[in-house]
Amino acid sequence: MKKIILTLSLGLLTACSAQIQKAEQNDVKLAPPTDVRSGYIRLVKNVNYYIDSESIWVDNQEPQIVHFDAVVNLDRGLYVYPEPKRYARSVRQYKILNCANYHLTQIRTDFYDEFWGQGLRAAPKKQKKHTLSLTPDTTLYNAAQIICANYGKAFSVDKK
């Protein structure tokens, strides 16, 4: 998953920063935070991929749909800003989970100049939705089960 995110990020970086001179952009190695910030849930041990628990909400119209943000703290700075010395330290991805069929849709990806999806936002001009069916016994599937179980109670109680 981390390789896919980095590949997509590098592709977006190339598209967004074509006019910036490469000589000014040295490779920036980052030291992501080692402590997990309150309100964030690490998906995999020793991987900087988190769910922002404060961003989770259930759709009013379709209670099987849960919206949330995933955050990736980067270990290399990405030059996605017009300023040649500003770089992204994190990526925030807006996702929608369908608890009825375990389809996960990535709606939007934004870059931030601080860790934890904070700070100045840079959004790619073109973004495509991407939906995948989660496979049982994978980290994302297990996380989806937990999200659906915890937030499923909220909408099943409302139906009474």
UniProtKB/Swiss-Prot annotation:
GO cellular component, one term: cell outer membrane
Record key words, sorted: Cell outer membrane, Lipoprotein, Membrane, Palmitate, Signal, Virulence
Domain of life: Bacteria
Main location: membrane
Signal sequence region: 1-15
InterPro entries noted in UniProt: Adhesin_E, Adhesin_E-like, Adhesin_E_Pasteurellaceae
Stored Gene3D superfamilies: Surface-adhesin protein E
Subcellular location as annotated: Cell outer membrane; Cell surface
Lipidated residues (N-palmitoyl cysteine): C16
Keyword set includes Plastid: no
Membrane topology: Lipid-anchor
Lipidation (S-diacylglycerol cysteine): C16
Pfam entry (one): Adhesin_E
General function of this protein: Acts as a multifunctional adhesin involved in direct interactions with host epithelial cells and host proteins.
Name listed for the protein in its UniProt record: Surface-adhesin protein E
Taxonomic path: Bacteria, Pseudomonadati, Pseudomonadota, Gammaproteobacteria, Pasteurellales
